[in-house]
Amino acid sequence: MERSSIFQPKRFVKVFAVLLPLLFNGYSVSGANPTEAPVAQHTEVTANAAESAHVAEAGAAHGAEGHGEEKAGDVIMHHILDSNVIAFDPFGEVDLPKIVVAGFDISITKHVVMLWVVSAIVIALFAAANGQYKTGSAMRAPKGIANALEALVDFIRLDVAKANIGKGYEKYLPYLLTVFFFILVCNLLGLVPYGATATGNINVTLTLATFTFFLTQAAALKAHGIKGYLAHLTGGTHPALWIIMIPIEFIGLFTKPVALTIRLFANMTAGHIVILSLIFISFILKSYIVAVVMSVPFSIFIYLLELFVAFLQAFIFTMLSALFIGLASAHEGGHDEHEASAAHH
């Protein structure tokens, strides 16, 4: 049956075989701490000793406050940025190996480990769901995780892939499903204690967008051939305008993957910065009232909002990928309809 074939782990493993090279990509992270300001220079002794002492005390208080804000900012950046250390506060931390080959940093970093974990989780989930379909009756509704996965798979298959690509959507479905669940688990893992949001790393989002870009161009070449693909770069204009249209159309090929990259990266990074900033407000102001009235309630609200954003961003990336594939492979009859749909989104 069609439903049973969707849950074959082999289909997802094949796509992961293409996606997994990004897991070995090293990310260079600047871990340098800001240098502390030098000690206040020696000042002349004046007759008014009381005024000098007051000025010195005020300066020291201002310096301590600035140092506290700077330290809070360092902690926030430490949780957002990639690193060669996985912290398990208060139990300690694990140093990850640094690997440099021919001058290229391919070190195993925190986000690389998270990508490995996400890959294992996605494969395990669908392997478990496939096991239920093999052992259960075809007439019996799936239960538990298999039921939830089937609902999401049907949604991506019908409302995303089929709706945006149309005829022949089946051959792109394994990629779209893999991208959706991969991004979703990446986003959710960043909300778990000791986890990290790999999709908050622009290297990861750029790699995912690059896969969509190449798949889109392959779909265009298959649908229109070399001649039709190159003719699209001229935009159907007079040859005198080709010198203008070709560069514009060529640049336009790369605006879509860049938009995918920035959209996912910015949204997943911004939410975590807001949560951590709200938490640290109470520490900076040293006020329990601020913590109870503002920091904690707003942090919980933003955290719940992040759960929604995790699903939303996975859906948007997958939907736009399907839309770009549909635009690239659409023939002249359906081109205007796809263009109108793209403009609407």
UniProtKB/Swiss-Prot annotation:
Protein role: Key component of the proton channel; it plays a direct role in the translocation of protons across the membrane.
Quaternary structure and interacting proteins, as annotated: F-type ATPases have 2 components, CF(1) - the catalytic core - and CF(0) - the membrane proton channel. CF(1) has five subunits: alpha(3), beta(3), gamma(1), delta(1), epsilon(1). CF(0) has four main subunits: a, b, b' and c.
Protein name as catalogued: ATP synthase subunit a
UniProt cross-references to Gene3D superfamilies, sorted A to Z: ATP synthase, F0 complex, subunit A
Membrane-spanning segments: 12-32, 111-131, 172-192, 195-215, 240-260, 273-293, 307-327
Protein family: Belongs to the ATPase A chain family.
Main subcellular localisation: membrane
Localization annotation: Cell inner membrane
GO molecular function: proton-transporting ATP synthase activity, rotational mechanism
GO CC annotation terms, alphabetical: plasma membrane; proton-transporting ATP synthase complex
InterPro entries: ATP_synth_F0_asu, ATP_synth_F0_asu_AS, ATP_synth_F0_asu_bact/mt, F0_ATP_A_sf
Keywords (A to Z) from UniProt: ATP synthesis, Cell inner membrane, Cell membrane, CF(0), Hydrogen ion transport, Ion transport, Membrane, Transmembrane, Transmembrane helix, Transport
Membrane topology: Multi-pass membrane protein
Pfam families: ATP-synt_A (PF00119)
